[in-house]
Regions:
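Extracytosolic ligand-binding ectodomains
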Residues: 1-182
Length: 182
């Protein structure tokens, strides 16, 4: 669902944006080299850079022809808020232990931006007009006025939902098995 939210967000900004998906965990595969060899210069990389590796190649960044990297935006996670939400649900008795006993399923702790667990930092190097538009988009997401899974959505196989259909539910988002059409 993260890949699709990213793809839909990119498409909202630029309807002609194309997402090229390269898996970073494949053995003997240099995903960055593959993207750059295709002429792709704007990359959504790891959310964080390892402490032992000084790098600017995280979040959404751009690689210039000379190899210089400039950051555009990066997600930030408030792990304190994450654990606070989980502990509060345990203390209030709303925690569902049955999720822990299904060893064949990955656990999904999906919290949107409105929860305070995740936010985004925009680069100070962004053009003021882009910063203005992205700030308005962020505020729309936080207020619930804008949601990537509202409105018409197309997968690579065709229409997922038309513009009048309700927003995808949390369960539909977490369990999606399709890729956006861009």
């Amino acid at each position: 669902s993260n890949v699709n939210a990213f793809a839909i967000g990119a498409q909202m900004i630029n309807p002609y944006a194309r997402i090229h998906l390269e898996w970073s965990a494949l053995r003997d595969h240099d995903w960055k080299k593959s993207l750059l060899s295709q002429g792709i210069r704007t990359i959504s990389g790891p959310e964080l850079t390892p402490a032992k590796k000084l790098s600017r190649e995280f979040g959404v960044y751009r690689v210039a022809e000379d190899g210089a990297v400039s950051n555009i935006a990066t997600p930030i996670f408030d792990w304190g808020r994450f654990y606070e939400i989980i502990l509060r649900s345990i203390l209030e008795g709303s925690w569902d232990n049955s999720r822990l006993t299904k060893s064949h399923e990955a656990l999904n702790f999906w919290f949107g931006m409105e929860s305070g667990v995740i936010d985004v930092i925009l680069s100070g190097q962004l053009h003021y007009a882009s910063r203005k538009m992205l700030t308005a988009l962020r505020e729309g997401v936080l207020s619930g006025r804008i949601h990537p899974f509202d409105g018409e959505i197309h997968s690579q196989e065709g229409l997922i939902k038309d513009a009048q259909a309700p927003r995808l539910s949390s369960e539909e988002i977490v369990n999606m098995h399709w890729l956006n059409d861009n």
